[in-house]
A protein has these predicted regions:
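Membrane-helix interface and discontinuous TM-entry motifs in multi-pass inner-membrane proteins
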Residues: 157-171, 251-266
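A juxtamembrane structural motif centered on a specific transmembrane helix
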Residues: 1-13, 334-403
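Glycine/serine-rich anion-binding loops at beta->alpha junctions
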Residues: 116-126, 166-168, 256, 260, ...
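Hydrophobic alpha-helical transmembrane segments of multi-pass inner membrane proteins, especially
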Residues: 22-24, 28, 45-240, 281-341, ...
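Alpha-helical transmembrane segments of multi-pass membrane proteins
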Residues: 25-40
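Long extracytoplasmic/lumenal interhelical loops at the membrane interface
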Residues: 256-290
Length: 403
């Protein structure tokens, strides 16, 4: 019976079991913590009906796992062929969002999907589109990296996509820009060209920082962070940081090593976005620093696993794609945790595959599935080689017997 269950799992969940394991673990943590963290909005809007939020979140969790399964079954080379089309579509969606998107907290980041009436951020799709397109361009011209046409194409795509995202989501644009720089460095882009792309990207980000839809908010957050750092050794540290960080510090302090127990969080009633941007302090408050360390390790595992998969990929595109997606996911997770403990300014970035989310949760699942697809690319090839060698040996034995 046990062997049959294992056979079913191996049959339908192909590829890297480590990535699958981290995804299921993060999804489980997400359901448990979000169910507790949504108490405040549940009482505010639905008379304490937390099940309404839970059901919606669980649906998105399973949708994300489903998207992960679908993308892991698609040969990763297909994304190479579609990457340029994805990029054009992403740019169009970003422009439409800036012009006609839903305005929340002074920024237009969301579009509403007709019929199902679900909001989604085109920037999530744009991140994947840019990463896959850069991986495709670098892979096809590994021997011609200094080609001027390629250089200007890469500069153009990075500047346009990062710039459009930065207008409404500066933190997300910074994260994507950093991921692209890692991808270009690993893709063996010469230092001179690398510096040109960095300067172009920083120039666009600087303009967006000052004149973007959330420019003043970004400046205010940086000022508050600097003020907090300057007063880090004084008794006035609590009053020198934003309210959300004050409550985040309290949540972490209450949690200690082992936490106050599931559902016993107090700071969830005071901490803004306790189920989203600041879900990490709630994780620690209820389950302790032990869970906080476990979550950090999981993101590092995803990053290093992505590097391992990339190093064994049969193609340059597969390797670069795995690195880009795994680094993007891990960077976002580490940045979110760094914000919660005051190491970085407040960003508004959710904790991947843990924060309550809709389509962003699904796009994260898709990214994990594509990483597994790259793993399957060389794993299936190795299996075919083993099978082919076995057939050849059997044929040789049959020839000897007949002789």
């Amino acid at each position: 019976m046990q062997k049959n269950k294992e056979h079913i799992v191996l049959k339908y969940l192909k590829g890297d079991k480590v990535i699958w394991g981290t995804a299921f673990l993060l999804a489980t943590i997400s359901i448990l913590v979000v169910y507790s963290a949504v108490s405040a909005p549940a009482f505010k809007f639905f008379g304490g009906n937390t099940e309404k939020f839970l059901i919606k979140h669980v649906i998105f969790v399973f949708a994300a796992l489903g998207a992960m399964w679908v993308t892991h079954m698609i040969p990763y080379r297909a994304y190479d062929k579609l990457s340029r089309g994805f990029l054009f579509l992403a740019i169009v969606l970003l422009i439409i969002t800036l012009a006609f998107g839903v305005d929340i907290h002074g920024a237009r980041r969301w579009l509403i999907i007709p019929i199902v009436n679900i909001q989604f951020q085109p920037s999530d799709f744009a991140k994947f589109a840019l990463i896959s397109n850069l991986a495709s361009m670098l892979a096809k011209r590994q021997g011609k990296i200094e080609d001027q046409t390629l250089i200007w194409q890469m500069i153009l795509w990075v500047v346009v996509v990062v710039g459009l995202i930065a207008v409404a989501d500066f933190s997300g644009a910074m994260l994507l820009f950093g991921t692209c720089m890692v991808l270009l460095y690993i893709g063996r882009v010469p230092l001179k060209i690398f510096a040109q792309i960095v300067m172009g990207g920083l120039a666009v980000l600087s303009v967006a920082f000052v004149f973007g839809q959330r420019g003043q908010t970004a400046i205010s957050r940086v000022d508050q962070w600097i003020n907090g750092v300057e007063n880090s050794n004084s008794a006035n540290i609590v009053n020198s940081v934003p309210d959300q960080l004050q409550y985040a510090y309290m949540a972490i302090a209450r949690g200690g090593l082992t936490g106050v127990g599931p559902g016993n969080s107090t700071m969830r009633y005071f901490l803004p976005e306790a189920f989203s941007d600041f879900v990490f302090p709630i994780c620690i408050e209820e389950y302790g620093m032990i869970l906080g360390i476990v979550i950090m390790i999981i993101y590092l595992i995803i990053m290093f696993r992505g590097m391992s998969i990339a190093s064994r990929s049969a193609t340059a595109f597969g390797g670069l794609l795995a690195i880009g997606l795994s680094f993007s996911l891990a960077f976002q997770g580490l940045v979110n945790m760094a914000v919660a403990v005051g190491v970085l300014p407040v960003t508004g970035l959710p904790l991947p595959f843990i924060s309550m989310g809709g389509t962003s949760f699904i796009f994260t699942g898709m990214s994990l599935g594509i990483i597994i697809s790259v793993y399957r690319g060389y794993s299936d090839l190795a299996d075919d080689n083993i099978e082919g060698n076995a057939i050849k040996k059997a044929e040789k034995k049959n020839v000897k017997v007949e002789q």
